Amino acid sequence: MDVQQIKTILDAHGSWLRNEVGGVRADLRDADLRGADLRDADLRGANLQGANLQCANLQGADLRGADLQGANLRGADLRGADLQGANLRGADLQGADLRDADLDFSAWPLWCGSQDAIVDARIASQLAAHFCVLVCDDPAYQAARKALLPFACTSHRAEDLGLVEI
């Protein structure tokens, strides 16, 4: 997809977000966006299912509520991106840089596709907090939870999740 096509789609999407006549939600399903410069793009609610965003620059992009199911985000720069409520199921985040990204209420892929993702302490503590609220009576889990709990309690979501250090 060339730069002009992307610009046209983003302009129509912006109109859609503002409820303007002629606005159309961005449909970038299966689009080849490898290496695309989408810094600070407003892609709220966009359909990016199966899109190839390998090595794309999405730094500071607004992807709230975007559907990135099955997207290839290998090596993508997502630093400072807002991914609140984004669907990342089946997305490949290997080598993606998510430092300073906001992943609140998003679907983080719990499979090998999220291995090697680069995160900051905020995201790591949030993942740890979600791990620590699981209910499991296995002694190995209990030991891991006990070791992880102090770090998990530093999460900005710890209080919402009812986490307290024991």
Report residues per predicted region.
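Catalytic phosphate/metal-binding cores of nucleic-acid and nucleotide-processing enzymes, i.e., regions
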Residues: 64, 74, 79, 89
